């Protein structure tokens, strides 16, 4: 049932950022990949070592890793059980930022503060439509069109438009 938990993280309508300090291996790496963004401390290490136990990742690692870093490199890492250091994870697109360990939580808060002033309904729809791209049972483009249209009916859209036209900061209510 772990995959249901990880899918819930991935589909959470509120932003979820993984703050990785140290090792994120196996399920820990899979949990980080389920988050919307990842911030790594300089000492972070990432890997999927399940093949050493005769297993494959069971909580979405075989799906999310190629989505994040590309098929060829993902297959290499899954088959060899090699680990990535924080800088390589950043270079490959697995993490959004690499910071000194003592700045890890501050960087996460900084990102969340930037997001917190945006329209909550639109943030939730971004999560939904981006994830639809990777869901083979859904048409990501159709989902985007439907959710885009739905945003026009929200109070947040009206507030955002009014704030823009009146050159003031929007005060979103999440409705």
Residue ranges and their predicted role:
Residues 122-128:
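Amphipathic alpha-helical segments used for helix-helix packing
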Residues 77-78, 129-134, 147-152:
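Helix-loop "lid/cap" segments that line or gate small-molecule binding pockets
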Residues 1-2, 157:
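Conserved donor sugar-nucleotide recognition element shared by glycan-biosynthetic enzymes
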Residues 2-6, 112, 130, 141-148:
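Hydrophobic alpha-helical core bundles mediating ligand binding, dimerization, or RNAP-core interactions
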Residues 132-133, 167-171:
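A short structural micro-motif
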């Amino acid at each position: 049932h772990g995959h249901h938990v990880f899918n819930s993280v991935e589909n959470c309508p509120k932003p979820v950022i993984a703050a990785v300090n140290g090792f994120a291996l196996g399920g820990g790496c899979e949990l980080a990949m389920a988050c919307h963004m990842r911030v790594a401390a300089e000492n972070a290490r990432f890997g999927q070592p399940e093949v050493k136990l005769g297993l494959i990742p069971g909580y979405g690692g075989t799906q999310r890793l190629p989505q994040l870093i590309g098929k060829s490199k993902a297959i290499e890492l899954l088959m060899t059980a090699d680990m990535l250091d924080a800088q390589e994870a950043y270079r490959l697109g697995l993490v959004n930022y690499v910071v000194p360990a003592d700045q890890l939580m501050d960087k996460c808060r900084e990102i969340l503060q930037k997001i917190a002033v945006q329209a909550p309904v639109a943030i939730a729809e971004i999560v939904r439509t981006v994830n639809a791209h990777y869901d083979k049972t859904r048409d990501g483009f159709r989902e985007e069109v439907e959710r885009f249209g739905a945003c026009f009916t929200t109070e947040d859209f009206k507030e955002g438009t009014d704030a823009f036209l009146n050159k003031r900061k929007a005060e979103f209510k999440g409705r």
